Amino acid sequence: MVLTFFPASKAEPKIMLPRLYLRPPVRGDWKEWAELRAVSRDFLAPWEPLWPDDALTRSAYRRRLAAYSEDWARDHGYAFFIFRRQDDALVGGITLANVRRGVAQTCSFGYWIGRPYSRNGFMTEAVHGGCTFAFDEMNLHRV
């Protein structure tokens, strides 16, 4: 895994994996994110809370980005989108959430993958990259 840092305009950090890369979501990802979530809605429903009626709108996405940014700034959580390196296709997302410092040094790990990309080992690779980030970059002890 290679962790590289870019200027803020290019969404840092970028975690490079063999077939994928992880990076924080940006405004320009909305359309691809909304399309992937829409075609994967039934597939994701058993594991996710009910979606509000406006879940896939641009304004809901912007609120989501604002929450991600605040969590990142406060060291409470770290959201990443997962992209396939060969074509930069968005395949899913991971979130390191509920970060607790002090003695615990722990977080929760959430993830989702779009239906078209399931059963390809992408999430296994992304989880490995996310855990490496949690332990090596965030200095957590438990995930």
Predicted regions and their residues:
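GNAT-family acyltransferases
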Residues: 1-116
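Residue-level recognition of short, well-ordered coil/turn positions
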Residues: 76-77, 122, 139
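Conserved acetyl-CoA-binding loop-helix of GNAT-fold acetyltransferases
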Residues: 112, 119-133
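Conserved GNAT acetyl-CoA-binding A-motif
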Residues: 136-143
